[in-house]
Amino acid sequence: PTESPWPKNAGLLFFHDTPERFFPSVQIDVVWFPEGAGGDRFEEQIFKGPLARMTREALGYIQRNFLRETVIKHPHRAEATRVWNFPYAAIEEALVNAVYHRSYEEREPIEVRISHEELVILSFPGPDRSIRLEDLQAGRAVSRRYRNRRIGEFLKELDMTEGRSTGIPKILKEMATNGSPVPLFET
């Protein structure tokens, strides 16, 4: 069989230096609200490029600039408790899921909104319609219908995802282990 002379969408998204030329708004916007979302100031950093590089760069930026560890000493024991304002493993899982499951037909970027109180990841159009919100919040978001199966295969090869519906349970576990509030999922 002859090979197709045209690149596949997943190939452009992972291997072209500027996939946003073909898919507008393929980017991750990280927005910092130092006064909260209702404040008058914000700072933004926009990440573009091949999906894996863009995702890793956004995660590194978030980790370097916004994650803080607090050490709590206890009077009657030698071990201190260490907690993070936002656990990195949960953020990593959530952002990779957003890249994996977003619609590349939508002309909206993935947006990470950060304030002192919360970190919100917006990705459109949200979870697949076959996943109920109640199941998502309970960590039972098991769907064998993937919006972007080929993207998932590439992310799996890059050790960025497992592709076995483990993302939401991992986010819930990491948040609980850190002593963080249960994350809120909305559709």
Locate the predicted segments by residue.
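Conserved beta-strand-loop-beta-strand hairpin that lines the nucleotide-binding pocket
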Residues: 7-11, 15-56, 86-187
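Core subunits and conserved enzymes of cellular information-processing
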Residues: 1-7
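Conserved mid-sequence domains
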Residues: 81-85
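Helix-hairpin-helix/helix-loop-helix acidic hairpins
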Residues: 42-44, 51-80
